[in-house]
């Protein structure tokens, strides 16, 4: 008996009106993740994955390109409004927010969620170059 081929259903992308953009800006790289309101990732992009290597990865322009790529992928879900959460001290903080705004998203809120110790662990020793 020959099996009839079962067709896989085409996945319908859920329509999300508003979501959150998490920007992790370290000194070496910038990671932009766009999620829905529950925190489920819709799209993400990094400066390193956008073709920048080495010291060019840690530039504001690389963060801008990463934010544009993440925004382009998130537009397939019908995203209109984003709430931005910025984490880290890196150079790509402001430029990635501007790129999300220029991509057509309405930035409703910007929150800095960088962890600040209340005098916790001892920091690493100063660099001698």
Swiss-Prot record:
GO annotations of cellular component type: ribonucleoprotein complex; ribosome
Molecular-function GO term, any one: rRNA binding
Matches recorded under PROSITE patterns: RIBOSOMAL_S11
One Pfam family hit: Ribosomal_S11
InterPro entries: Ribosomal_uS11 (IPR001971), Ribosomal_uS11_bac-type (IPR019981), Ribosomal_uS11_CS (IPR018102), Ribosomal_uS11_sf (IPR036967)
Alphabetic keyword roster: Ribonucleoprotein, Ribosomal protein, RNA-binding, rRNA-binding
SUPFAM superfamilies documented for this protein: Translational machinery components
Gene3D superfamilies on file: Ribosomal protein S11
GO biological process: translation
Keyword Transmembrane helix: no
Keyword hit for GTP-binding: no
Stored HAMAP family: Ribosomal_uS11
Functional description taken from the UniProt entry: Located on the platform of the 30S subunit, it bridges several disparate RNA helices of the 16S rRNA. Forms part of the Shine-Dalgarno cleft in the 70S ribosome.
The protein's assembly and partners: Part of the 30S ribosomal subunit. Interacts with proteins S7 and S18. Binds to IF-3.
Database matches in PANTHER family: 40S RIBOSOMAL PROTEIN S14/30S RIBOSOMAL PROTEIN S11
Name of the protein: Small ribosomal subunit protein uS11
Organism: Psychromonas ingrahamii (strain DSM 17664 / CCUG 51855 / 37)
Lineage: Bacteria, Pseudomonadati, Pseudomonadota, Gammaproteobacteria, Alteromonadales
